[in-house]
């Protein structure tokens, strides 16, 4: 039989990149309550949450849900308007559940939650000659965006702050591991402290954001007082609550 050569580079290019996937940390197995909460969120912000890809994280539960409950939850969330695409929390029980449900288990969550076996402490190392401390690592320079971030675009500043000198349009998303400074209008989404830094902040000269988030905590435009819209504001996290205040 003649062999067939397939040029995969021309047929399709596969890359693992930064994607906007929401993480739903499940705190109860009350499926109707979970579904109703999600339905309300989609209703309040359909452009943000409608058909959003969602990872289910059962790490906050004392017991893994059974297959019937997990199926009911996935079906309910789809009916509420979001798309559950994977499971987080890489224990063996969750791994089995993901196989039974036919959804992937995201490996990047395993190291965060997987308990490790306790091993005896290693013997103390022999005394070593004191070495001078290495110089402190310089922080990564901030990323600067001089042109507008348009609808459908996503901009990510890894391990640094992000400065945008123009507009962030509706449907656009800017993300930074540090703080975000926007000198134009913010109509899209801004997510600071993306790797969990609660001290990150968002500064904006003209605030109309669809969503702002810091270290995973978020607030949508419908929750923002009318007197702050269109103003220069700063956004910060205080006791796990998003705070927004005018700069003027």
Swiss-Prot record:
- Tell me the Pfam families matching this sequence: MinC_C, MinC_N
InterPro entries in UniProt: CAP/MinC_C, MinC, MinC_C_sf, MinC_N, Septum_form_inhib_MinC_C
One Gene Ontology BP term is: division septum assembly
Record keyword Cell division present:
yes
Q: Where is the composition biased (Pro residues)?
A: 118-138
Q: Which UniProt keywords apply?
A: Cell cycle, Cell division, Septation
Q: Which SUPFAM superfamilies match?
A: Cell-division inhibitor MinC, C-terminal domain
**Signal peptide extent:** none
Which residue stretches belong to region Disordered?
A: 115-144
The Swiss-Prot or TrEMBL record describes its family as follows: Belongs to the MinC family.
Q: What is the documented function of this protein?
A: Cell division inhibitor that blocks the formation of polar Z ring septums. Rapidly oscillates between the poles of the cell to destabilize FtsZ filaments that have formed before they mature into polar Z rings. Prevents FtsZ polymerization.
- Subunit structure as annotated in this protein's UniProt entry: Interacts with MinD and FtsZ.
Protein known as: Probable septum site-determining protein MinC
Where is the organism placed in the taxonomic lineage, from the top?
Bacteria, Pseudomonadati, Pseudomonadota, Gammaproteobacteria, Lysobacterales
């Amino acid at each position: 039989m003649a062999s067939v050569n397939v040029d995969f580079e021309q047929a399709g290019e596969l890359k693992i990149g930064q994607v906007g996937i929401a993480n739903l940390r499940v705190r109860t197995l009350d499926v109707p309550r979970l579904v109703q909460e999600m339905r309300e969120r989609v209703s309040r912000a359909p452009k943000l949450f409608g058909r959003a890809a969602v990872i289910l994280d059962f790490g906050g539960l004392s017991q893994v849900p059974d297959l019937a409950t997990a199926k009911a939850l996935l079906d309910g969330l789809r009916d509420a308007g979001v798309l559950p695409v994977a499971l987080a929390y890489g224990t063996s029980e969750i791994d089995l559940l993901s196989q039974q449900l036919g959804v992937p288990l995201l490996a990047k969550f395993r190291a965060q939650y997987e308990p490790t076996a306790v091993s005896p402490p290693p013997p103390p190392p022999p005394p070593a000659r004191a070495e001078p401390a290495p110089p402190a690592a310089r922080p990564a320079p901030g990323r600067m965006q001089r042109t507008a971030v348009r609808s459908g675009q996503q901009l990510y500043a890894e391990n640094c702050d992000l400065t945008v000198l123009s507009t962030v349009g509706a449907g656009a998303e800017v993300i930074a591991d540090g703080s975000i400074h926007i000198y134009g209008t913010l109509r899209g989404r801004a997510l600071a402290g993306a790797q969990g830094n609660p001290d990150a902040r968002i500064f904006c000269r003209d605030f109309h954001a669809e969503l702002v988030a810091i270290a995973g905590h978020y607030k949508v435009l419908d929750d923002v007082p009318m007197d702050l819209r269109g103003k220069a504001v700063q956004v910060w996290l205080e006791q796990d609550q998003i705070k927004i205040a005018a700069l003027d």
